Amino acid sequence: AGFAGDDAPRAVFPSIVGRPRHQGVMVGMGQKDAYVGDEAQSKRGILTLKYPIEHGIVSNWDDMEKIWHHTFYNELRVAPEEHPVLLTEAPLNPKANREKMTQIMFETFNVPAMYVAIQAVLSLYASGRTTGIVLDSGDGVSHTVPIYEGYALPHAILRLDLAGRGLTDYLMKILTERGYMFTTSAEREIVRDVKEKLAYVALDFEQELETAKSSSSVEKSYELPDGQVITIGAERFRCPEVLFQPSFIGMEAAGIHETTYNSIMKSDVDIRKDLYGNIVLSGGSTMFPGIADRMSKEITALAPSSMKIKVVAPPERKYSVWIGGSILASLSTFQQ
């Protein structure tokens, strides 16, 4: 969250709401009935954490309202009734959801005006394009969204219910095979950090496995909060490989490369060339080193042999949805 015209968000925090597991023993300890974002994260030991956004779509409106309240009053410190608001939504977000979001903004927060934009379209704007296909992969869901002249093509949008959370779960599982047990919601956050700091995508998975078996070049160490040091090897690239091979976690779904290809094939034949040449990665789960090269390699193998393929991975892509929103909302044409 932040202000239109800024080049980076003012506030970045996880969309989590935590509630105390046990009622406060001592009265007047100032224990709140709910904690949001980083505060929920840091007090996770005594809380039950809930994610009001599932697979990119809001499923718990009371908690979502708490998150918005926290955003306006604690993070941005603005009076929402004084500012028009741009919100974003997942592609193919149900109409009822958009209406509910609008209702809360106008009735609870009294905003003067609002607009809801599709996340992937904003990412494309942020990359300086109006035509291309965006692979947006965040925490709960990945989408491939073909966009032509600024408009998403709904019939060709594909959704994959696999993203950051699934990768963290898988890393927890394969670290268990090494004898490192991570089970609680507090420990899952540690594993998420391991993933973000050490995981990478192999250009050739099988070959990388051989390398990992025969040498220690892949191994890295990580210090846990309690000072214990763990060593992680092949897990580093086995974790994000799930994006390309969802069968690793028992999902009968096409990987991100194949989903992107299928999305292009669902688009009008006349614009496919423009899509192949403008494949834009967006979202935190596209931040793995090596992902763009691998994506390029896989799409090249699927596409017609003469096709020019370009995969773009902007360095700021973790926040490119927000940046695109900042650009859009600061246009004078948009404000009217």
From Swiss-Prot:
Gene3D superfamilies: 3.30.420.40, Actin, Chain A, domain 4. GO terms for cellular component: actin cytoskeleton; cytoplasm. It comes from the Eukaryota. One of its GO terms (molecular function) is hydrolase activity. It is an enzyme of class 3 (hydrolase). There are at least 7 different actin genes in tobacco. Belongs to the actin family. Actins are highly conserved proteins that are involved in various types of cell motility and are ubiquitously expressed in all eukaryotic cells. Essential component of cell cytoskeleton; plays an important role in cytoplasmic streaming, cell shape determination, cell division, organelle movement and extension growth. This is Actin-104. It comes from Nicotiana tabacum. The lineage of its organism: Eukaryota, Viridiplantae, Streptophyta, Embryophyta, Tracheophyta.
